[in-house]
Amino acid sequence: MKVFCGRANPTTGSLEWLEEDEHYDYHQEIARSSYADMLHDKDRNIKYYQGIRAAVSRVKDRGQKALVLDIGTGTGLLSMMAVTAGADFCYAIEVFKPMADAAVKIVEKNGFSDKIKVINKHSTEVTVGPDGDLPCRANILVTELFDTELIGEGALPSYEHAHRHLVQENCEAVPHKATVYAQLVESRRMWSWNKLFPVHVQTSLGEQVIVPPSELERCPGAPSVYDIQLNQVPSTDFTALSDVLPMFSVDFSKQVSSSAACHSKQFVPLASGQAQVVLSWWDIEMDPEGKITCTMAPFWAQTNPQELQWRDHWMQCVYFLPQEEPVVQGSPRCLVAHHDDYCVWYSLQRTSADENEEVYQVRPVCDCQAHLLWNRPRFGEINDQDRTDQYAQALRTVLMPGTICLCVSDGSLLSLLAHHLGAEQVFTVESSAASYRLMKRIFKANHLEDKVSIIKKRPELLTSADLEGKKVSLLLGEPFFATSLLPWHNLYFWYARTSVDQHLEPGAVVMPQAASLYAMIVEFRDLWRIRSPCGDCEGFDVHIMDDMIKHSLDFRESREAEPHPLWEYPCRSLSEPQQILTFDFQQPVPQKPVHAEGSMELRRPGKSHGAVLWMEYHLTPDSTVSTGLMNPLEDKGDCCWNPHCKQAVYFLSTTVDPRVPLDGPQSVSYAVEFHPLTGDITMEFRLADTLN
């Protein structure tokens, strides 16, 4: 059956109705899931297996039957481990139907159908009794309900319900316990992901400073955690103000509460500085003795950094304090971890929690609009003074006496730069209510509410009256649009430029004047694992899961790229960067598709995992801003990526199909096409010897 789905097209800006298979959302969820990454997590799998063996042995040693409840079974892997370890029976709970169906097949393929019952329900809907899903309560509870924040996938309510209704009192639990750790740091780089810094502009009248509104200064920020690969943040980018502090633990073998709570930890600052950011991670102990431990600690907090396990389904957390606060070396303070049933947040106190009335009991929520409009990388981009200087320098070359400027980008400071650098009149278009309110506040804080005109409209709806009857001589964009996911989605600027063509004077300047799509073949250190089939996992055949993911990729994304922030995922270039397509913003969007095909020579040995694609914006003939590679490639091909943008990754067949040989091909062929009607870019990259 087909269904019609309405979607906003991020490139053209139009609402489209697409005919989709009724299961398209299932396929999308499977294709973009972390199942493959989890199966490749050797450390996780081994530790779970060890913990399950130990738990089954403890129950058997007491002369009891080992009855296992596995919540969130996924592939059924942990249940199969339990049966192999000697469990008498397993009840495997999986709420996602396609996954539950796959688990049934995997369990059958491995010969465990007589010992494992897969139940397609949410665990809170599972019943116990003669006519229930379970005939009696289980005495071993096995779960993998954790995310980077530990509790973000509803682990606490699920455990709370399981202990009340599904498992015996004092049951064995794998994992047995989790502990959340935190470290207070000062970091200008990370703080720039949360607050707007003053922006400095050199003008003919001297230095002008764009200041943030007081509402942004006071705002506690976005309520959500920022999860990143913290191992890719150099230790030179932050100063530790505290030791690593164990903030709180959860014993999964006993009754768990999902009620809101706070946990205070006193510490003595290691250095004086501005307390801004809390870095956090967790570990899980698989056994009561704490001998079998799986940790998410970054390299500097590891006892054996050389044995660091890469994983993407669990990373580390960056939390921002509501406000930065000075701490003094040697003067004790308290760090407080707060949590409700799904979220964690932090506050800093002078004394213990019961003596301080200013504890943030309620989760911080943005009230300034900026954190709703700008994500963390966007804050970093706006705070990048070198980038601002490049735009300012380009503006100086195109601004003329009497310039009438129109700025088209979401929540951009370019309109302020244009004003300070001498534009006679500046208009800026803000199509969303959030960006309109935010920019009003920024203009007011800088006493520019009468100097820069904000128009709350989509560009295609602009009228001559909106522009006070004037013709635009400079059309300006970064471009940045909040709805963009892939690098080329910001080509919406080109569509906006086309729709305002009637308002441009003859010979009007457009900045950027053009854009180019670049591609490069790379070998990833680790990212390839998220799309690589597993085959065998700890002795269990999971090919069915591999096939399921491949089918979903073929259904939806086999010819698509996916966005990844590659500064977090090291890779080596195997080819030189190659310009694939160019888009001339001086001209309207063409009517006919733009096609390019060719090949990329592999200049370095390695495994061709994928093609990375990014956009470069040519502000002027002499100034280009890259959303991808930031520096020329080093001899070994190590890449330095723009940290404020996500790049697009097209995984090659060598990654998703192990039958394709990794070595041998000397080039990669490509065919890329831009479709003006939809704004889509379709592509195919193939190793030279897989063309037939």
UniProtKB/Swiss-Prot annotation:
PROSITE patterns: SAM_MT_PRMT. Residues 14-345, 358-684 form the SAM-dependent MTase PRMT-type domain. GO terms for biological process: genomic imprinting; peptidyl-arginine methylation; spliceosomal snRNP assembly. The keyword tRNA-binding does not apply. It catalyses: L-arginyl-[protein] + S-adenosyl-L-methionine = N(omega)-methyl-L-arginyl-[protein] + S-adenosyl-L-homocysteine + H(+). The modification Omega-N-methylarginine is found at residue 32. Its EC number is 2.1.1.321. Confers resistance or sensitivity to DNA-damaging agents. Down-regulation confers increased sensitivity to the Top1 inhibitor camptothecin (CPT). Arginine methyltransferase that can both catalyze the formation of omega-N monomethylarginine (MMA) and symmetrical dimethylarginine (sDMA), with a preference for the formation of MMA. Specifically mediates the symmetrical dimethylation of arginine residues in the small nuclear ribonucleoproteins Sm D1 (SNRPD1) and Sm D3 (SNRPD3); such methylation being required for the assembly and biogenesis of snRNP core particles. Specifically mediates the symmetric dimethylation of histone H4 'Arg-3' to form H4R3me2s. This is Protein arginine N-methyltransferase 7.
